[in-house]
Amino acid sequence: MTYSLYEHNRVKKFFKKHKRDKVLLLRITKKYCEILDNPYNAEFIELTSVKCPKCHRARVGNYRIIFYVSEKYQRIEIIDIIPRKNDYKLL
């Protein structure tokens, strides 16, 4: 099953802010490929947040990729990339 990828504006803002950190951006794009291959991997933990009850989290160093899998539209929505220290205060 193939999924399309959709990024929210907060993710685009994150990439603009960190465009000089090529190593981090490369690690995030590799994790994107892993998410697209298998979004229900055991490595990606499902969150129990009130605001986003069916969201998952993927770990990339000190950052977390928060994403949602929409089976209806066959798409993965990357909601946000947040630092670990602010991990769940925003959700």
Question: What kind of region is each of these model predictions?
Answer:
Residues 31-34, 84:
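Conserved short hydrophobic interaction patches
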Residues 33-58:
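A short, surface-exposed loop/turn module that caps and links secondary-structure elements
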Residues 28, 39, 91:
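Short, flexible helix/strand-to-coil boundary loops that buttress conserved ligand/catalytic motifs
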Residues 12, 41, 84-85:
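Alpha-helix N-cap/helix-start and coil->helix boundary motif
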Residues 1, 43, 54, 74-77:
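Residue-level signal for beta-strand positions within conserved beta-sheet cores that form or flank
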Residues 10, 49-52, 83:
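Residues that form or immediately flank small-molecule/cofactor binding pockets and catalytic motifs
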Residues 1-31:
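Arg/Lys-rich, positively charged N-terminal/basic patches that mediate binding to nucleic acids
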